[in-house]
Regions:
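Helix-loop-helix hairpin linking two adjacent transmembrane segments in secondary transporters
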Residues: 147-190
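C-terminal membrane-cytosol helix-exit motif in multi-pass small-molecule transporters
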Residues: 179-198, 386-393
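Helix-to-loop junctions at the C-terminal end of transmembrane segments
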Residues: 71-82, 270-282
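Conserved MFS/SLC helix-loop-helix module at the cytosolic interface between two early adjacent transmembrane helices
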Residues: 69-108
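Juxtamembrane intracellular "pre-TM" segments in multi-pass secondary transporters
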Residues: 5-16, 193-223
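Structural signature of the two symmetry-related core transmembrane helices
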Residues: 85-99, 285-300
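Cytoplasmic helix-loop-helix junction between adjacent transmembrane helices
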Residues: 113-152
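Helix-breaking motifs and short loop linkers at transmembrane-helix boundaries and internal kinks
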Residues: 50, 82, 103-109, 120, ...
Length: 393
């Protein structure tokens, strides 16, 4: 137990200056570049490697696939062997395989390297939030999750522009950036101070304990909320919003990218302020507010007739997203005991990937029946469902 004086000292310190958290920021900024940094190069890759537009999407698919299969397994290993023993080799694999892509001119070999890079990326997202859960608690936990989410949003907003600029020099230049994972890996190895769990229970007992925890009603509701959030995010927003902007308003890819970057920037600013917001509102109230804002933003989008008016739902959606994701992650982290937290967070990360996969498919079906506007109203409806679920947390 921490003494009262220690708690006061921790409350007064600026948590974002903590070396451990800054290293976690570095890991976050590294693994999210796996997709966003290369997508602006896709048109050039299609042309230079003489492949179809359909095939170029495999560069994302083969990168993402290992995460679905390996994330829970690597979470179990991290609980038993330690976080750093998984993160360090994962960063090495991510950086080296990613860097080798820079030198490859054969598409099949490029896919193999992307698959290997995806294996390296698989545990990084869930283990960063696991370590935050290990290091911080209560209001500090919310603040740390908020800062990490803010960093992730800033990276998501800036990487497409950086990748696009590099792709103007050559299609393969964006692939060199993941090499930064190598020095980040050594920072983790020598400078990251994290409590490593002493887990001596048999693997079967370990899995039984985790399974029992996952069956808790509150955790089940959090998992459902997580899936629905990512169905809405990757279906209604990530898939349908660009289609609306391009097909209905004739906006260029550059303008669409800048508009969508606005959400990430607003989310980044909002997340960075969660440490202050949590002093006035509970986590449940923050979640309720975020779902109301999600529903409002998605309901407004189909009604807009002038492109410049999109700044209204962009601001609303960005605020909602900046509030929501860090709080969801914090609730997951709090629900898991330290000995099983990596497994626990890995399962939650896998549910996010399920929502990410289902979102475009489900909203594609909605579009075929009710049109593009129906996809936004469906997303708003899902937000209301999540608002109701939060009452039962």
């Amino acid at each position: 137990m921490k003494s009262g004086e220690e708690e006061k000292r921790k409350d007064k310190r600026k948590i974002y200056l903590d070396t451990n958290l800054q290293i976690i920021f570095g890991i976050t900024l590294t693994y999210i570049m796996g997709v966003s940094i290369i997508t602006p190069a896709f048109p050039k890759i299609v042309k230079e490697l003489n492949i179809s537009a359909k095939d170029v999407g495999l560069l994302i698919a083969v990168f993402s696939f290992p995460g679905i299969l390996l994330t829970p397994f690597l979470g179990v290993v991290a609980d038993r062997w330690g976080r750093k023993k998984i993160i360090f080799p994962s960063l090495m694999l991510f950086g080296i395989a990613g860097g080798l892509c820079f030198f490859v001119r054969d598409f099949k070999l490029l896919l193999i390297l992307r698959l290997i890079q995806g294996i390296g990326a698989a545990p990084l997202g869930s283990l960063t939030v696991t370590i935050i859960g290990d290091l911080y608690s209560r209001k500090e936990l919310i603040a740390a999750m908020g800062y990490n989410s803010s960093i992730r949003s800033m990276g998501s907003a800036s990487y497409p522009a950086i990748g696009g600029a590099l792709a103007m020099v050559g299609w393969h230049y964006p692939f060199i950036l993941p090499v930064i994972a190598v020095p980040i890996g050594f920072l983790v190895l020598f400078n990251l101070k994290t409590p490593e769990p002493e887990n001596e229970v048999h693997i079967r007992e370990h899995l039984n304990i985790v399974w029992k925890k996952l069956r808790n009603r509150q955790v089940v509701r959090l998992l459902v909320i997580g899936i629905i959030i990512f169905v809405m995010l990757f279906g209604s927003y990530m898939t349908c919003f660009p289609l609306l902007l391009g097909n209905s308003f004739g906006l260029s890819s550059l303008i669409i990218g800048l508009i969508m970057a606005g959400v990430s920037l607003i989310a980044a600013v909002t997340s960075s302020q969660l440490g202050k917001i949590i002093k006035f509102f509970s986590k449940k109230i923050i979640l309720k507010i975020s779902f109301i804002l999600y529903a409002l933003a998605l309901s407004i989008i189909p009604l807009i007739s002038q492109p410049w008016l999109f700044f209204i739902p962009i601001i609303i959606f960005g605020i909602a997203h900046g509030m929501n994701i860090p709080v969801i992650q914090a609730l997951f982290a709090e629900a898991a005991p330290v000995k099983y937290r990596a497994t626990f967070m890995s399962v939650s990360g896998m549910t996010f990937r399920v929502g990410q996969t289902l979102g475009p498919l489900l909203m594609g079906m909605v579009i075929s029946i009710w049109g593009i506007g129906g996809a936004f109203y469906a997303g708003a409806g899902l937000s209301i469902v999540m608002f109701i679920i939060v009452f039962r947390l």
